[in-house]
Structure formats: structure tokens, C-alpha cells
């Protein structure tokens, strides 16, 4: 099977596993925003934000190393046992250290939800490790099923805990915890991970090699956390937890969009890693990037174009201020797509230091712009800082990766896209019914 067919096949498998439940979760947004207050919604979002910060710090990003290492050793059973054993044994020790430190610090944390920061971090670590082992072994089918179990069980339990039991924020956090536990158990049993685990197979030298790959990804992950999550903390501090709930609702549309891209990105990472040293690698990368960028630009413009019609249906009126942040976050996420396409080149070349460097620079830009503007323009500071930093990182990475592969982006496409962008934004904020209909028709023609 050639590279393109393999890429399409793997993407299709992962899409079935992820997009269905993501769509269900998305369409339950009116339910969540109706039954939860902005404060409750903001609290859940803030705790999930802290969980995402703790993950790379606790794991040293070793789940990324196990995936990359397994790709090169799929046919070597003994090497697989060594990689899995080293990863699992190491992560268990790291989790024990995290538990001890948390229990020492917890008496000083005055929050009703604090223990979810312990349990949800542990559950997310195990599900992430299991999923990356499955993916590293080339079993995208079970990776997709595991992801489906996480998402579907979380959605179902959210409905039970929030609608029936009326547990509020506790319900959402318990649902997330349960979903990750079920995913971990599924992969562990179906893939028979226990057969690969032996303390005797733990390898110190291998661990050093894996950490050499994964440690530079920690600042990268924290930088991504700054992009995606520090906004919430800054907004909560300066504007209040209710405004964080508004921002969280704004992100739901761009989060769905980037989820669709991330499904492709997983298979794109694998494909690029396998073929980065081919003679025609530059042509392969360029053609793939152009097709994907055109597709996701059309999707982005389509979401913005239809948003004036969809928003009143999807979002409760107490979250109405989130309307104004959505197009800015959508455009920021479009540049994030470009960043993701380019970052795969670094991963394929095992140059994780370059990934970290560019991410840190952009994260600093994000913080400076956000902190500099939030007192003057309020919630807009969070979305604008995200847009500026993603744009800066996309431009830098595009120039920087040329030393590995020569990438050419269709100039005609770029010109049309940059003409469409301001026209679409003007129409969105004027929010005139007839003008919105015209823009939807133009977007459809563009697509």
C-alpha cells in the first residue's frame, strides 16, 4: 500500500473512533450550558486546565517517546518488551512520587475539588500510555476504539451525573475520570499489555535514550499549555471565574475543529516519520500540506460563516458574550493547524529541541500580549494573544523546516484566503441577516 493510501486508511480508522463521540459531546453543549452556571463551567474548565499542566511534568512526556520508539521496532518482540517494560515501570515510580508530593501539599489547598487533581491526572496518564503503546505498535483500530470508549463513556456519564443526579461540576469531573479508567483497562486487556511487562526487562540505557527524546517535549508541552490554558487562569484572576466560563464556551467550536485536525495529525506523524528520508520527501510533504491546508481553511471559514445561525441554538443566552471570541479563536486554530503540520517534520527528524524552542518563543509572546492587553480590552486579550502567537509560530516554523524539506505552499490559495478573512470577520461582527446569508454562499463557493 503506498504512502497516500496508508495515510488515508489510518485517518479514516481514527476518524470513526473519535469524531462520532466528539460530535455527540459538542451537540450536548446546549445541555451543559443550560444546567451549569458560568461559575461551575469555569471551575471544571480550570481544573481540567491544571490536569493538562501536570501531565507532562509528571510523565516527562515519556508516552511520546514510547510511541516514537515502537514505530522503529514493530517487528522485534524482545525490543517491544524492553520498551514497554521500561516505560510502564518508570511511569509507576513517577506516579508514586506525584502522589506523595500531592498528599504533602494538599492540606494547604483549600478547594472542594482538589482531589480530582490527583485522580484525574493518574487516570489520564494511564490512558495516554496505553493509547500510545497501541498506536506505536501500529494498531490504530484499537487506538480508535480506546479513544471512543473514553469519549462515549464520558458523554454518557455526564448526562447521568448532570441531568439525572444533578451533581453539577462534580459530575463532569467524575465522568472524565471514569472515561479514562475504562479506556486504560480496555487497551491493557485487549492488547495484552501485561505480557510485555517485566521488571527484568527494565533498561536504564534505554530510559536515558527515551528521556533524551522526551525531555525537550516538556517545555514544548508546557508552552502548549500556556497557549491553550494559561488564558483561563489569567482571565479568572483578572476578570473572574464567570468570564472563564464564557471563554470556555467560546473554545468549544475551535476545540471541535482542532480535534478533527488532530485525528489526521496522528496518522500524518506516523507517515512522515516512516518516509521523511525518501528521495521525494519534499514533494510528498508539500502536496500533503497544500491539500490539508486548503481543506481546513475551508472548514474554518465555513464554521465562522454559519456561526451567526448556529450560535443561538447551541449556546444558552447567559453565555452570549462568547459569540465575539469565536472567530478570533477559529483563525488562531487555523494557524495552529499549520503549526501542527510543520511540527511533524521536527518529530520525524527526532529534533524535539527545535519543537521546544519554537513553542517556548510563541508561548512567551502569548503571555506578553495577554497580560499587556487584558486590562484594556478584557476577554478579547485572551483570544487575540492566542491568534498572534500561533501566527508567529506558524511563520517561524515554515521558514525553519526548509532546512529539512523544501515545502512550497500554493500562493494563489494564500492570496484568496487572506482576502476572504477580513471580509468574513466584518460580516460576522456586523451580524446582519442578509449579509450573513451572502457570506455563507460565498464560503460555500470558496470551499
Predicted regions and their residues:
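N-terminal membrane topogenesis motif
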Residues: 1-24, 78, 141, 145, ...
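Interhelical loop/hinge segments that connect adjacent transmembrane helices in multipass membrane
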Residues: 1-3, 7, 115, 169, ...
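Alpha-helical transmembrane segments of multi-pass membrane transport and lipid-handling proteins
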Residues: 23, 58-59, 64, 85-115, ...
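Transmembrane alpha-helical segments of multi-pass transport proteins
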Residues: 362, 410-447
Amino acid at each position: 500500500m503506498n504512502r497516500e493510501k496508508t495515510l488515508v486508511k489510518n485517518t479514516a480508522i481514527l476518524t470513526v473512533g473519535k469524531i462520532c463521540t466528539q460530535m455527540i459531546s459538542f451537540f450536548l453543549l446546549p445541555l451543559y450550558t443550560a444546567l451549569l452556571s458560568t461559575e461551575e463551567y469555569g471551575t471544571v474548565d480550570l481544573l481540567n486546565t491544571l490536569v493538562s499542566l501536570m501531565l507532562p511534568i509528571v510523565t516527562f512526556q515519556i508516552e511520546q517517546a514510547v510511541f516514537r520508539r515502537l514505530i522503529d521496532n514493530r517487528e522485534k518482540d524482545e525490543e517491544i518488551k524492553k520498551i514497554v517494560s521500561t516505560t510502564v515501570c518508570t511511569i509507576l515510580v513517577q506516579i508514586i512520587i506525584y502522589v506523595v508530593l500531592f498528599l504533602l501539599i494538599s492540606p494547604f489547598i483549600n478547594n472542594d475539588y482538589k482531589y480530582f487533581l490527583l485522580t484525574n491526572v493518574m487516570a489520564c496518564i494511564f490512558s495516554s500510555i496505553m493509547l500510545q503503546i497501541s498506536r506505536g505498535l501500529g494498531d490504530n483500530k484499537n487506538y480508535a476504539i480506546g479513544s471512543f470508549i473514553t469519549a462515549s463513556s464520558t458523554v454518557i456519564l455526564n448526562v447521568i451525573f448532570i441531568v439525572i443526579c444533578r451533581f453539577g461540576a462534580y459530575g463532569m469531573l467524575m465522568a472524565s475520570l471514569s472515561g479514562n479508567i475504562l479506556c486504560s483497562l480496555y487497551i491493557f486487556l485487549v492488547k495484552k499489555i501485561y505480557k510485555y511487562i517485566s521488571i527484568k526487562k527494565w533498561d536504564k540505557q534505554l530510559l536515558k535514550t527515551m528521556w533524551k527524546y522526551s525531555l525537550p517535549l516538556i517545555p514544548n508541552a508546557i508552552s502548549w499549555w500556556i497557549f491553550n490554558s494559561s488564558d483561563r487562569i489569567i482571565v479568572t484572576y483578572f476578570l473572574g471565574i464567570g468570564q472563564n466560563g464564557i471563554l470556555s464556551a467560546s473554545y468549544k467550536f475551535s476545540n471541535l475543529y482542532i480535534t478533527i485536525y488532530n485525528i489526521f495529525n496522528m496518522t500524518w506523524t506516523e507517515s512522515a516519520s516512516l518516509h521523511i528520508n525518501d528521495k521525494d520527501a519534499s514533494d510528498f510533504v508539500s502536496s500533503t500540506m497544500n491539500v490539508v491546508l486548503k481543506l481546513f481553511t475551508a472548514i474554518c471559514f465555513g464554521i465562522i460563516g454559519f456561526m451567526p445561525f448556529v450560535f443561538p441554538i447551541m449556546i444558552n443566552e447567559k453565555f452570549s458574550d462568547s459569540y465575539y471570541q469565536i472567530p478570533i479563536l477559529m483563525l488562531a486554530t487555523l494557524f495552529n493547524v499549520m503549526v501542527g503540520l510543520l511540527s511533524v517534520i521536527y518529530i520525524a527528524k527526532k529534533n524535539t529541541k527545535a519543537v521546544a524552542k519554537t513553542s517556548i518563543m510563541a508561548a512567551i509572546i502569548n503571555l506578553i500580549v495577554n497580560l499587556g492587553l487584558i486590562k484594556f480590552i478584557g476577554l478579547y486579550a485572551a483570544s487575540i494573544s492566542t491568534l498572534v502567537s500561533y501566527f508567529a509560530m506558524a511563520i517561524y516554523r515554515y521558514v525553519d523546516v526548509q532546512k529539512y524539506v523544501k515545502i512550497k505552499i500554493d500562493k494563489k490559495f494564500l492570496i484568496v484566503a487572506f482576502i476572504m478573512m477580513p471580509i468574513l470577520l466584518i460580516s460576522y461582527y456586523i451580524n446582519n441577516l442578509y449579509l450573513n446569508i451572502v457570506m455563507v454562499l460565498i464560503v460555500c463557493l470558496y470551499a
